[in-house]
Amino acid sequence: MPKISVIGAGNVGATLAQRLIEKDFADVVMLDVVEGIPQGKALDISQSASVLGFRHTITGSNDYAQTAGSEIVVITAGIARKPGMTREELLAINQKIMTDVVSNCLKYSPEATLVVVSNPVDTMTYLAWKLSGLPRKRVVGLSGVLDGGRLATFVARELGVNPSAVSPCVMGEHGGSMVVMSRFTLVNGKPLSELVSPEKADELAKRAVNGGAEIVAFLKTGSAFYAPSASVAAMVEAIFLGSGKVMNCAAVLDGEYGLRNIVLGVPVKLGKGGIKEIITLPLDGQENARLQASAEMVKVQIASLSL
């Protein structure tokens, strides 16, 4: 049976594992270092099989050997962002976690595609790529799928349309410098830039940029996990099924948009093995300047890694 492993059984990891097993295209292994947590959550999820009708199995474990032969490994492990904590402050702790996770995952699944969710995700995706030694196409991070989902929600509310009518385009860092591309964000096929004023577009963009922090402020003791897990599940499905679907993801760039040796959110075509193609949009001068500025923010984080 094909297998997908989820590393980390916190809110994002466990909800993702649930979403994946309900899609019923592969067995799911949920791994965590805390004994009992992945086992208990997996058992709970498995007891919904007769209700929902999925046939594949979900297993919880503390042993990386259980992940052997995974086609895709999703890395959610890391500490959650707390109120007032920046993504950069997560870096030192999550770098140590990522180093251990990548080593163990590839020991048992050397052919796996890595999907990185841990924050700060652009930098963690870069770190996973460097640690793994894998081709850049086999390492991808959560970015614009989530940010775009947030944007689509606010655009839909503003214009009174269904969120599914919005095709968002959010590029750059998954963080404060992310860039909403209004010309390439479509609402029923029409550019957002033609439907709202520049001021309104900026207002919607700021709401999307602050979407994660807004949730953290409400929750007090945690961060978002429903929309993030849904976003990652969509990415995993596109990779596993080889759909060729275009999504905005954190990808290793090698000349695209004039950038090299960096991970940044850009449109990519996902399929078997990870990224099949990086889509280069015809950005105008202002759009490109904003993307380059966002890249500079990520470069600062990457430079602080201990490699």
Curated annotation (Swiss-Prot):
Enzyme class: oxidoreductase
Keywords (A to Z) from UniProt: NAD, Oxidoreductase, Tricarboxylic acid cycle
Binding sites annotated in the UniProt record for substrate: R81, R87, N119, R150
Keyword Oxidoreductase part of the UniProt annotation: yes
Signal peptide: none
SUPFAM superfamilies xrefs: LDH C-terminal domain-like, NAD(P)-binding Rossmann-fold domains
Active site residues according to the UniProt entry: H174
UniProt-listed Enzyme Commission number(s): 1.1.1.37
Domain of life: Bacteria
Gene Ontology biological process terms in this record: lactate metabolic process; tricarboxylic acid cycle
Binding site for NAD(+): G8, A9, G10, N11, V12, G13, D32, N94, V117, S118, N119
Catalytic activity: (S)-malate + NAD(+) = oxaloacetate + NADH + H(+)
UniProt keyword annotation of Signal present: no
Family: Belongs to the LDH/MDH superfamily. MDH type 3 family.
Stored PANTHER family: L-2-HYDROXYCARBOXYLATE DEHYDROGENASE (NAD(P)(+)) (PTHR43128), L-LACTATE DEHYDROGENASE (PTHR43128:SF16)
Role description: Catalyzes the reversible oxidation of malate to oxaloacetate.
Protein name from the UniProt record: Malate dehydrogenase
Protein's organism: Dehalococcoides mccartyi (strain CBDB1)
High-level lineage: Bacteria, Bacillati, Chloroflexota, Dehalococcoidia, Dehalococcoidales
Gene label: mdh
